């Protein structure tokens, strides 16, 4: 369980409370962003809201498997953000992301080393560890985008 605790800690670092790798995390970057900025488009870049949705989409999809459901996520739907038209819409998206992230980390913490090495749904997807670490790496990739887009939005105002 030491491995799962370390992996869960890395996951929480990027999403909820860490500063070790990037000196920031999603919660720090997005919590104080008004919905108007979250939906502000800079050229062809994704919006902050779209990136938050995208990361949450994958977390929720893998979380569904952790909780006994099927793997239903598809890349083509991962940016299918419903319209954000109010503070309430934006807050709901963020609250869903934070809640899913904490549930995800909790499931990871409870995984045995043996479970981490089991095939994830199908052998073609690798094992649980690979998929969890993939979510962490994917999250850091987009965290860099979030940070840069946020700076661009602030500079454009």
Residues of each region from the PLM?
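Active-site rim elements
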Residues: 8-16, 87-94
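Structured helix-beta-strand junction loops
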Residues: 33-36, 111
């Amino acid at each position: 369980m030491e491995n799962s605790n370390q992996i869960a800690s890395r996951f929480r670092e990027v999403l909820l409370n860490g500063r070790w790798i990037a000196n920031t995390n999603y919660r720090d970057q997005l919590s104080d962003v008004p919905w108007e900025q979250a939906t502000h488009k800079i050229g062809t870049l994704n919006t902050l809201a779209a990136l938050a949705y995208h990361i949450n989409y994958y977390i929720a999809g893998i979380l569904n498997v952790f909780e006994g459901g099927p793997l239903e996520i598809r890349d083509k739907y991962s940016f299918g953000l419903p319209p954000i038209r109010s503070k309430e819409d934006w807050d709901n998206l963020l609250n869903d992301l934070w809640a899913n992230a904490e549930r995800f980390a909790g499931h990871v913490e409870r995984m045995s080393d043996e479970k981490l090495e089991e095939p994830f749904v199908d052998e073609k997807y690798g094992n649980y560890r690979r998929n969890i670490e993939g979510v962490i790496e994917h999250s850091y990739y987009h965290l860099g985008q979030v940070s840069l887009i946020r700076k661009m939005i602030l500079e454009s105002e």
